[in-house]
Amino acid sequence: MSPTTIAARVATFQPVVRRLSLHQVPGGPTFLLDTAKAPYHSLKLPLETLRSVSAVRKRFVLGQISDYAGNSTAKYREAYRAAREVADEVIFVGATAHKACAPDDDLAQGKFRAFETVEAASAYLKGTAVAGEVILAKSASNLHLERLLLDWDGAVRCWPNECGSRASCFECNGYRAPFSEHGGRPGRTTQRVGRPQT
């Protein structure tokens, strides 16, 4: 294959949704969604991407980390330390949010925030977002942090932290209805939405 052909194909490559995919909200932030997997050993890769972008503000949202040995608190603490060096604000979401062990100074300065639910984190992001900022969302798939993007127009009505569905919210498309109406089972009219934008 010629270098010209390779360059042409690379130039038109679209990332897979939820694998560090780029999503721009008109007049709002840009999301980098990395919500398909979150093995501990790979956390620094998306953080390096966040470091490399130019933005008026950079925020990092972490849900759940997977695939690590040893003490989970130590892993979340290390993840927080790495993120605080890159992001203006670090947000932890879910049952493990307290494991960041952020220093008191970071709490006082608003460098760190913790939310028990994805719904609360979404409300906070929507209430504090500025045009031109970049928000990197990173988590294992079971927390469905893609809802942070999908809720930007208020469309999300399915808010359990873990619904049990292995399908992403893009695939399930049940996020527009309360969980009690669909139980996390993808509908028969499932459609692909949320294609990455450049």
Residue ranges of model-derived segments:
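ATP-dependent carboxylate-amine ligase
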Residues: 1-198
